Amino acid sequence: MSKQNQWIVGVNAVASSVENDADNVREVLIEAGSKNPRLTEIEEQARRKGIDVRRVNTQALDGVGGQVRHQGVAARYAAARLWAENELEGLVEAAQGRALVLILDGVQDPHNLGACLRSAAAAGVTAVVIPKDKSATVNATVRKTSAGAADRIPVVAVTNLARCLRDLQKQGVWLYGLAGEAEASLYSVDLRGNVGLVLGGEGDGLRRLTREHCDGLVKIPMPGDIESLNVSVATGVTLFEAVRQRLGA
């Protein structure tokens, strides 16, 4: 696993980090003179957990927040753990025939990636796989959007997605790619065993090579006039169909 220091800003993101990932929080910055009770709560909790807290001016917070609205608070801490590709095999084995792996083929918008991770954590996935290149990374925006989910599930960054898919298949993981033109419905396939759900990025969807490595393609039936869903919405729909089947098994 690898980690690097980064800044997280915003009340909810910092509060979640202090509550759920205190061991990795290096320090908390709070706007001097603020009377916001939420900031007081964050400061008190951080101090209880032994985290350094500094009161700073707005300019200092602007400097670490960049273009993201900081709401008077920021935290410096080790980024979410990124699991190595060779650790994925052990995660699948530990699931004992019921692995649920989410594979995201080039989701570039950090807000979408964060929303996908949040759904993945809620669904209890075994791991989320993302490419190291041509994909959003688990940065401050992703962590804020994920509401702490990036800390709770293994996110595996891989150099070669096609090779990773082949390795999953060797472990008995059946790969279903989501594609609007597919003939089979998501609701017609068995998602109860070792399953990998593969979704493409914004715009182009699954890349050709990724499609070729899927064992089957499925679609979400949409009787309305809209032909596609946002990738984070499609991820939630797909994951929770798997959850529904598994809970009913």
Curated annotation (Swiss-Prot):
Subcellular location: Cytoplasm
InterPro entries reported in the protein's UniProt record: 23S_rRNA_MeTrfase_RlmB (IPR024915), Alpha/beta_knot_MTases (IPR029028), Ribosomal_eL30-like_sf (IPR029064), rRNA_MeTrfase_TrmH (IPR004441), SpoU_MeTrfase (IPR001537), SpoU_subst-bd (IPR013123), tRNA_m1G_MTases_N (IPR029026)
EC number: 2.1.1.185
Broad enzyme group: transferase
Catalytic activity field: guanosine(2251) in 23S rRNA + S-adenosyl-L-methionine = 2'-O-methylguanosine(2251) in 23S rRNA + S-adenosyl-L-homocysteine + H(+)
MF terms (GO), sorted A to Z: RNA binding; rRNA (guanosine-2'-O-)-methyltransferase activity
Pfam families registered for this protein in UniProt: SpoU_methylase, SpoU_sub_bind
Gene3D superfamilies the record matches: 3.30.1330.30, 3.40.1280.10
Record key words, sorted: Cytoplasm, Methyltransferase, rRNA processing, S-adenosyl-L-methionine, Transferase
Residues that hold S-adenosyl-L-methionine according to the record: G200, I220, L229
Cellular component, GO, one term: cytosol
Segments traversing the membrane: none
Functional description taken from the UniProt entry: Specifically methylates the ribose of guanosine 2251 in 23S rRNA.
Protein name: 23S rRNA (guanosine-2'-O-)-methyltransferase RlmB
